[in-house]
Amino acid sequence: MIATELENIIRNSNDLDSMQEAAVKLSELQYSRFLEIALEYLEQDEVDAYFQALLIDCIVPADIERVLPCLLHREKPIEAYLLGDIMKNMMYLSPQDNARKYIPEINERYQKLTDNEKESIREYYEEFKNQYSL
């Protein structure tokens, strides 16, 4: 498939599996176009959080900082699994110095989760706390 076809699937499909597959392929085929689309989708509150987590996973380490403001500055609460994915990517992908400015916002978002939600991502949060000395 060519990049245009993959982009059409991402934008027009109602099938989340097809959208995810197309996003992964587009990230491998034409990364710069994928990044534009990913940033667009990450800014939208109504986009499925699992799809947003997949987009984050496809973004290369050098660009993860471009993603964080899209997610952390919106008013809608971030689902626990998406917040866990953000923490995971910050620990393994971002340089520690660059990621530090997002720590207070991530910690604040974590504190707003319910006890069950916190428990579901506790492992990521504990690693995150240890790495950033919270």
Give residue spans per PLM region.
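Alpha-solenoid helical repeat architecture
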Residues: 10-14, 42-46, 59, 75-79, ...
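Structural detector for internal amphipathic alpha-helices that build alpha-solenoid repeat scaffolds
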Residues: 17-29, 40, 50-64, 73, ...
